[in-house]
Amino acid sequence: MTPWFLYLIRTADNKLYTGITTDVERRYQQHQSGKGAKALRGKGELTLAFSAPVGDRSLALRAEYRVKQLTKRQKERLVAEGAVFAELLSSLQTPEIKSD
C-alpha cells in the first residue's frame, strides 16, 4: 500500500493551501510549475510549509477535509507544532461507535 501525505503550501501572500498526495516532492513541483491546483496559479513564490504521512487514501481525505475546516490561526499552529497534527490524526483514526 502506498502511503498518503497531507501537505500545506504557503503562497507569497501568506495563505495556506492544503492538499494530499502520495509523492509530496512531485506534487510540490507540479504546483511550482503551474501544473497543480488552479488555486495556486499566479500566487507568486510557493513554499512547502508542512507535510506528514497520514496512512491510506481514505484517512488522507478525512485529514484534508478536517484541516481545510480549521481557521488560519489553527493551521499556523499545526505547521508550528507537530503534536497538533498528531492529535488531529489520532482523532480521525478513533473508530466511531454506532448505536443500533
Curated annotation (Swiss-Prot):
- Coiled coil located at which positions? none
User: Which SUPFAM superfamilies does the protein's record reference?
Assistant: GIY-YIG endonuclease
Q: Which domain of life is it from?
A: Bacteria
Cited Gene3D superfamilies: GIY-YIG endonuclease
Note the InterPro entries from the entry: GIY-YIG_endonuc (IPR000305), GIY-YIG_endonuc_sf (IPR035901), UPF0213_domain (IPR050190), UPF0213_GIY-YIG_endonuc (IPR022992)
Q: Any idea where the GIY-YIG domain is?
A: 2-77
Q: Which Pfam families match?
A: GIY-YIG
Q: Which CDD domains match?
A: GIY-YIG_UPF0213 (cd10456)
Protein family per UniProt: Belongs to the UPF0213 family.
Under HAMAP family, the record lists: UPF0213
The record's listing under PANTHER family reads: UPF0213 PROTEIN YHBQ
- Protein name according to UniProt: UPF0213 protein YhbQ
To which species is this protein native? Escherichia coli O1:K1 / APEC
